[in-house]
């Protein structure tokens, strides 16, 4: 039996682990948190920091592993591309391309040169240089650590004082101490998730993003959006242009963007599975086998026999149950008006476990489906009020 290494075992990778086993692979997970739920689904767990590309390469060689699948983190993508390149494996972009796409400064520079619409960024490595720059800018701006995901190391600034604080935050959070400063674009934040085969988009889904508790961390999403067809076509053309320019491999390609004055401004991109089992929701509204396609693409298997299914719902989404303070959680209740729409639920915290970072931690995830989009939107906007979380302290 061939051995496959997946670079983490969190909730986000659980469906990939299950898919790899369905495909007949002896599935090994890594990562440095042994308590993650996905490790129990795998055949074996080998602890390692998946951002340490040399450590992962050593594991691959010592354990006669045959192929590698990235995780829901940019560092994991960079590592998987590096290891695949060293081992001569198919299914992954070059290490150089992985860096271009998952380091904010390199990516923004690349797409600006390519002529794609994006907020114009300026890259910094020193506090003093950036401090001088923010005396001259038009506010608001946004400051982003160069190499982090999930909203970490990102702050909006509406004046010089806030900008200096945001710069210090980005420097302290980034592993490289590099960060970007760019104009804050006012508009609707959305994502487009596609699967690319032979540099052409063959499956696509758009979603609205909601971040009511932490403005830099998506808490809820709803698929599909009412995206203007011209906007969607422009995004598809941008994705295919990037794929052709960099000679990218088959796989997931996601763009996060802001629609302002009817035009999309690209702000982030990802070549990996998304967090919170997003692909489960994407399958619900498209019928496309996202997890199967991703795993097969990254291990170099044939994609010609992928089968589309009838979509589960017209609209679907996910919501991470969060709270507005730290403390010990006793439990939570979901009202019937929402419960009847839920098709999947995953508890993250057990009763009496502690929340110590309420701006980022989730109590549970719920996955819901609707036939009426306005009903879904109205409910999503009230979820933090109608889902009752009880504290034990």
Regions found by a protein language model. Give the residues of each.
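A conserved helix-loop-beta module that forms one wall/lid of the active-site cleft
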Residues: 85-153
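Protein kinase-like catalytic core scaffold
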Residues: 202, 265-268
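Peripheral (often C-terminal) accessory segments that flank ATP-dependent C-N-forming ligase machineries
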Residues: 295-393
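Glycine-rich phosphate-binding loop signature in dinucleotide/nucleotide-binding domains
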Residues: 59-65, 135-137, 174
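Internal nucleotide-binding/catalytic subdomain
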Residues: 156-261
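Active-site "cap" helix and flanking loop/linker of ATP-utilizing ligase/carboxylase catalytic domains
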Residues: 234-255, 260-261, 270-326
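ATP-binding N-terminal substructure of ATP-dependent carboxylate-amine bond-forming enzymes
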Residues: 1-96, 128, 323, 351-361, ...
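Short, well-ordered beta-strand elements within core beta-sheets of diverse protein domains
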Residues: 183, 227, 283, 363-371
């Amino acid at each position: 039996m061939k051995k496959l290494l997946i670079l983490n075992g969190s909730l986000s990778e659980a469906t990939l682990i299950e898919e790899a086993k369905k495909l007949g692979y002896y599935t090994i997970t890594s990562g440095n948190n042994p308590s993650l739920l996905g490790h129990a689904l795998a055949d074996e767990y080998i602890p390692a920091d998946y951002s340490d590309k040399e450590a992962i390469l050593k594991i691959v060689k010592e354990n006669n592993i045959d192929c590698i699948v990235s995780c829901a983190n940019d560092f994991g993508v960079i590592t998987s591309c590096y290891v695949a390149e060293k081992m001569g494996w198919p299914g992954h972009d070059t290490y150089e391309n992985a860096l271009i796409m998952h380091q904010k400064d390199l990516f923004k520079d690349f797409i600006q040169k390519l002529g794609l619409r994006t907020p114009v960024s300026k890259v910094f490595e020193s506090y003093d240089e950036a401090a001088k720059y923010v005396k001259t800018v038009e506010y608001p701006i946004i400051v982003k650590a160069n190499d982090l995901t999930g909203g970490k190391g990102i702050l909006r600034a509406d004046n010089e004082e806030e900008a200096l604080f945001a710069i210090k935050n980005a420097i302290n959070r980034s592993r490289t101490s590099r960060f970007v400063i760019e104009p804050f674009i006012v508009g609707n934040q959305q994502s487009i998730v596609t699967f690319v085969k032979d540099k052409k988009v063959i499956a696509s889904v758009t979603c609205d993003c909601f971040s009511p508790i932490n403005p830099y961390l998506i808490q809820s999403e709803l698929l599909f959006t009412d995206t203007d067809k011209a906007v969607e076509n422009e995004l598809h053309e941008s994705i295919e242009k990037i794929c052709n320019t960099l000679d990218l491999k088959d796989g997931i390609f996601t763009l996060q963007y802001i629609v302002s004055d009817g035009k999309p401004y690209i702000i982030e991109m990802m070549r990996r599975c998304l967090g919170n089992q997003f692909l489960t929701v994407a399958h619900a509204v498209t019928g496309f086998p996202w997890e199967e396609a991703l795993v097969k693409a990254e291990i170099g298997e044939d994609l010609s026999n992928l089968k589309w299914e009838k979509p589960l719902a017209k609209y679907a989404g996910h919501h991470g149950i969060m709270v507005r303070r730290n403390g010990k959680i006793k439990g939570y209740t979901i009202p019937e008006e929402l419960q009847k729409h839920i098709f999947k639920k995953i508890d993250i915290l057990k009763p009496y476990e502690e929340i110590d970072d309420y701006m980022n931690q989730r109590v549970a995830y719920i996955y819901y489906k609707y036939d009426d989009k306005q009903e879904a939107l109205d409910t999503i906007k009230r979820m933090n009020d109608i889902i009752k979380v009880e504290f034990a302290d």
